[in-house]
């Protein structure tokens, strides 16, 4: 119940991407613990991801959610899609995303889809290359979204107005 109340209080969407059982081998045998990868977002351009580890699954998920809330970034969106095609990478994972017309939907796989949904992107075409490790895909996707610039940001950087940028 406390989790639901917290979710309603700050109005963030939460998605659990992966839960994994890991083990530590010690002299007496194996010690099992669990890891959880989560993303949170407000559906309007704010996203964060978190990775938690604990001896029990609920504790790992809770830690991951808390880390995701602390690790929030803001992304400039263009009416539910991207401003321009973007690439992101993290270690062996590379992602490519491009804007799509209204009604296309989110064409993305697994972990990338979860990030785009909580970010508030509704129409996008995307592809993951290289490693499909969920942690690396999430980090590459966030990297790509953070490096996306709106026409206003590009115009300000070049010292022009938006109409001159758009041609």
UniProtKB/Swiss-Prot annotation:
HAMAP family: Ribosomal_uS5_B (MF_01307_B)
UniProt keyword annotation of Ribonucleoprotein present: yes
GO MF annotation terms: rRNA binding; structural constituent of ribosome
Domain S5 DRBM: 12-75
Function: With S4 and S12 plays an important role in translational accuracy. Located at the back of the 30S subunit body where it stabilizes the conformation of the head with respect to the body.
A Gene Ontology BP annotation from the UniProt entry: translation
Family: Belongs to the universal ribosomal protein uS5 family.
Name of the featured protein: Small ribosomal subunit protein uS5
Keywords on record: Ribonucleoprotein, Ribosomal protein, RNA-binding, rRNA-binding
Gene3D superfamilies: 3.30.160.20, 3.30.230.10
Superkingdom of this protein's organism: Bacteria
GO cellular component, one term: small ribosomal subunit
Comment field on protein domains: The N-terminal domain interacts with the head of the 30S subunit; the C-terminal domain interacts with the body and contacts protein S4. The interaction surface between S4 and S5 is involved in control of translational fidelity.
Complexes and interactors: Part of the 30S ribosomal subunit. Contacts proteins S4 and S8.
InterPro entries referenced in this protein's UniProt entry, alphabetically: Ribosomal_Su5_D2-typ_SF, Ribosomal_uS5, Ribosomal_uS5_bac-type, Ribosomal_uS5_C, Ribosomal_uS5_N, Ribosomal_uS5_N_CS, Ribsml_uS5_D2-typ_fold_subgr
Gene name as annotated: rpsE
């Amino acid at each position: 119940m406390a989790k639901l109340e917290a979710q309603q209080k700050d109005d963030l969407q939460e998605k659990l991407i992966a839960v994994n059982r890991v083990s530590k081998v010690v002299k007496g045998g194996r010690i099992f613990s669990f890891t959880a990868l989560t993303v949170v977002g407000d559906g309007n351009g704010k996203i964060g991801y978190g990775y938690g580890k604990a001896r029990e699954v609920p504790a790992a998920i809770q830690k991951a959610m808390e880390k995701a809330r602390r690790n929030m970034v803001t992304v400039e969106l263009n009416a539910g899609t991207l401003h321009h095609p973007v690439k992101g990478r993290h270690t062996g994972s590379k992602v490519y995303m491009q804007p799509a017309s209204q009604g296309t939907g989110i064409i993305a796989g697994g972990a990338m889809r979860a990030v785009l949904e909580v970010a508030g992107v509704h129409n996008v075409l995307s592809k993951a290359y290289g490693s499909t490790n969920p942690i690396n895909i999430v980090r590459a996707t966030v990297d790509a979204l953070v490096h996306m610039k709106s026409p206003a940001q590009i115009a300000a950087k070049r010292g022009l107005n938006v109409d001159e940028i758009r041609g």
